[in-house]
């Protein structure tokens, strides 16, 4: 599989094809002969990293969170996107008895409502996906009760999102003596610290699942009910 990947990159990825055309004396079959890739190279000319067998406008445009530095724009084929979602359903959600038909909520930074808005809703609901999308940009002490009302109205079974945003919402609920029970809370994009986990578990009366992964789809890991990764 590695050799197939190296062969494809050498012949079909413009960035690497240009590299190996210049250094023909080196064997591309040996991984140690490949150049170390840095983010600046990708951000400078992202089109050089798209397989020539694909049309950029027919690919899914994603981006990294920038947890370790500069975020990246990525282009992913739709088969890989489907596999990614299937893996998440099977490996993460199913372990916590979360069905693919369960309504769910996500906290993210998409601007689903104007940033200056001071009155609800601070969310949108996707009926096709049974998804409640909550804006991370409006979570504050003055809006906590509004978020709780949205959770009660749409009754999601799990919550996914940025660790810090979920922690902030959990803390607000605790300060107002409120609890909203879920099957699980799944954190992403940021590390999960013990003090955050304690508040999230208390506010949502459920286990917290920490995930580690990359939008680049290089690797993925998550915590299991037994506490192991």
Predicted regions and their residues:
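Loop/helix-junction capping segments adjacent to catalytic residues or to phosphate/diphosphate-binding pockets
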Residues: 82, 113-114, 141, 194
């Amino acid at each position: 599989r590695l050799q197939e990947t190296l062969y494809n990159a050498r012949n079909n990825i413009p960035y690497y094809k240009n590299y190996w055309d210049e250094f023909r004396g080196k064997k591309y079959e040996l991984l140690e002969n490949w150049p170390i890739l840095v983010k600046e190279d990708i951000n400078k000319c992202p089109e050089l990293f798209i397989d020539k067998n694909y049309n950029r406008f027919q690919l899914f445009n994603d981006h990294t969170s920038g947890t370790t530095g500069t975020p990246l724009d990525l282009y992913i084929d739709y088969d890989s996107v489907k596999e990614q979602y299937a893996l998440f359903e099977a490996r993460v959600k199913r372990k916590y008895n979360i069905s693919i038909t369960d309504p769910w909520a996500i906290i993210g930074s998409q601007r689903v409502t104007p940033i200056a808005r001071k009155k609800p809703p601070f969310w949108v609901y996707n009926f096709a996906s049974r998804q409640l999308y909550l804006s991370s940009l409006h979570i504050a002490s003055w809006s906590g009760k509004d978020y709780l009302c949205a959770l009660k109205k749409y009754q999601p079974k799990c919550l996914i999102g940025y660790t810090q945003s979920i922690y902030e919402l959990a803390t607000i609920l605790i300060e107002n003596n409120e609890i909203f029970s879920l099957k699980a809370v799944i954190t992403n994009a940021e590390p999960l610290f013990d003090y955050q986990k304690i508040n999230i578990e208390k506010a949502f009366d459920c286990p917290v699942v920490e995930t580690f992964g990359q939008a680049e789809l290089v690797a993925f890991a998550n915590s299991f009910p037994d506490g192991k990764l």
